[in-house]
Amino acid sequence: MATVVPSQRGLNKLYPDARTALEGIVRDGMLLAVGGFGLCGIPEALIQALREIGVRNLTAASNNAGVDGWGLGVLLESRQIKKMISSYVGENAEFERQFLTGELEVEFSPQGTLAERMRAGGAGIPGFYTRTGVGTMI
């Protein structure tokens, strides 16, 4: 029987495509932290693969909601995102429509606060103080 060293599990894996890379690790209802700035540096192949796989009821945390037909806009169009945590959403008509009709839950967070929330969460820090949020719902 082969022994797998835990510190090496999952390292140096190459996948033929984004969909194969996501198999077995995505599920309905999960939270996705999506990188990039505006439409630059977004994981477009992974977003397309999520659409193809068909996971639903996702919470997406990103500095923006994409635009119609691009970025997270693709997952909004297919109704796969149920909640959006973002600092800017102004260029996506589908986002606006879903928000105004109550189909989409939205949480706005200043960009720096959003980045710190992601950093703190990744480090296991349950909360942090920021002067930006004093006196607000944040």
Give a label for each model feature:
Residues M1-I138:
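Conserved alpha/beta enzyme-core scaffold
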